Swiss-Prot record:
Listed name of the protein: Cytochrome b
Main location per the UniProt record: mitochondrion
Annotated GO biological process: mitochondrial electron transport, ubiquinol to cytochrome c
Transmembrane regions: 33-53, 77-98, 113-133, 178-198, 226-246, 288-308, 320-340, 347-367
Function: Component of the ubiquinol-cytochrome c reductase complex (complex III or cytochrome b-c1 complex) that is part of the mitochondrial respiratory chain. The b-c1 complex mediates electron transfer from ubiquinol to cytochrome c. Contributes to the generation of a proton gradient across the mitochondrial membrane that is then used for ATP synthesis.
Oligomer status and interactors: The cytochrome bc1 complex contains 11 subunits: 3 respiratory subunits (MT-CYB, CYC1 and UQCRFS1), 2 core proteins (UQCRC1 and UQCRC2) and 6 low-molecular weight proteins (UQCRH/QCR6, UQCRB/QCR7, UQCRQ/QCR8, UQCR10/QCR9, UQCR11/QCR10 and a cleavage product of UQCRFS1). This cytochrome bc1 complex then forms a dimer.
Binding sites annotated in the UniProt record for heme b b562: 83, 182
Organism: Cephalophorus ogilbyi (Ogilby's duiker)
Length: 379
């Protein structure tokens, strides 16, 4: 009799995705981040569910309810900090995952890549709305500043902002709807992740060489299941070290005072994982221009397959492109640092130069380097 995992309507889906899936024999640890993102998502949904049991989405009690979770609920503090730092781990894995895709040319699988970009946008939207929920100073002012950016849209901007706010300022209606959206979005992300996986399994995984691995495949289980478990253990180790030893390391102290509409914090800044985009936004003196640059800084990923001019898929054998890739990483780290600094000399000019460099690298320098490398192959 055939094994039940190969015949059962539900089990065979799991079997074909996680057990008997033919995988390249040479994929490195950079291919671990997909499964780690899945673990992060499950962890966020579970901790979020337990937080939602004790949280109240009302301007008068939201802050107190979070305090109540940390002080009075059994292990509430650990659930709250696992959720907050889980978001940071989520974004670390996301950035690594996207970086891997850029380096090894995984964007050639266009459907998988484009759904990945949509997933990135959805995750950023979810994290932003989640940051508003504790209703601290930075929650309130962050929500005010970021939603206000939509007013830069010509003609409909102001109406759009007031429609999102549910009034003439960020208030009870805004908090309630953000909670509703923050609750539903992770499930939309989970559904999109399934589609992401569906498209990936149509083509199979890429590998570090960028060459077809059809001639040399191994079963996903046990080889990559055990590898993913090791990755998961390391992820949990890092997360729990953060949670148990320095839970507020990545947070902003300005979010500890409760929201006060009459008092603006001296430096409004988002969580660390948005700082690079925030720096690009701030480096353009024009409001609409800044908003466009902000959106394009992520949306530019969609253009990656079109900007690929190399005859080789991966950067593994392309030293000039490798060099530019790591300059891009350094540039993004610079932008992240600038995003957390006040708007004054010399930070303004550094931010503007780093922003120009970001778009220049992706749109001009990297395609040029690929063309040069193609010509070098002829020698």
């Amino acid at each position: 009799m055939t094994n039940i995992r190969k015949t059962h309507p539900l089990l065979k889906i799991v079997n074909n995705a996680f057990i008997d899936l033919p995988a390249p024999s040479n994929i490195s640890s950079w291919w671990n981040f997909g499964s780690l993102l899945g673990i992060c998502l499950v962890l966020q949904i579970l901790t979020g569910l337990f937080l939602a049991m004790h949280y109240t989405a009302d301007t008068t009690t939201a802050f107190s309810s979070v305090t109540h979770i940390c002080r009075d609920v059994n292990y509430g503090w650990i659930i709250r900090y696992m959720h907050a730092n889980g978001a940071s781990m989520f974004f670390i894995c996301l950035f690594m995952h996207v970086g891997r895709g850029l380096y090894y040319g995984s964007y050639a699988y266009m459907e998988t890549w484009n759904i990945g970009v949509i997933l990135l946008f959805a995750t950023m939207a979810t994290a932003f709305m989640g940051y508003v929920l504790p209703w601290g100073q930075m929650s309130f002012w962050g929500a005010t500043v970021i939603t206000n950016l939509l007013s830069a849209i010509p003609y409909i901007g102001t109406n759009l902002v007031e429609w999102i706010w549910g009034g003439f300022s960020v208030d009870k209606a805004t908090l309630t709807r953000f909670f509703a959206f923050h609750f539903i979005f992770p499930f939309i992300i989970a559904a999109l992740a399934m589609v992401h996986l569906l498209f990936l399994h149509e083509t199979g995984s890429n590998n570090p060489t960028g060459i077809s691995s059809d001639a040399d495949k191994i079963p996903f289980h046990p080889y990559y299941t055990i590898k993913d478990i090791l990755g998961a253990l390391l992820l949990i180790l890092v997360l729990m070290t953060l949670v148990l030893f320095s839970p507020d390391l990545l947070g902003d102290p300005d979010n500890y005072p409760p929201a006060n509409p009459l008092n603006t914090p001296p430096h409004i800044k988002p969580e660390w994982y948005f700082l690079f985009a925030y720096a690009i936004l701030r480096s353009i003196p024009n409001k609409l221009g800044g908003v466009l640059a902000l959106v394009l800084s992520i949306l530019i990923l969609v253009l990656m397959p079109l900007l690929h001019t190399s005859k080789q898929r991966s950067m593994m054998f392309r030293p000039i492109s490798q060099c530019l890739f790591w300059i891009l990483v350094a540039d993004l780290l610079t932008l992240t640092w600038i995003g957390g600094q006040p708007v004054e000399h010399p930070y303004i000019i550094i931010g503007q130069l780093a922003s120009i460099m970001y778009f220049l690298l992706i749109l001009v320098l990297m395609p040029m380097a690929s063309t040069i490398e193609n010509n070098l192959l002829k020698w």
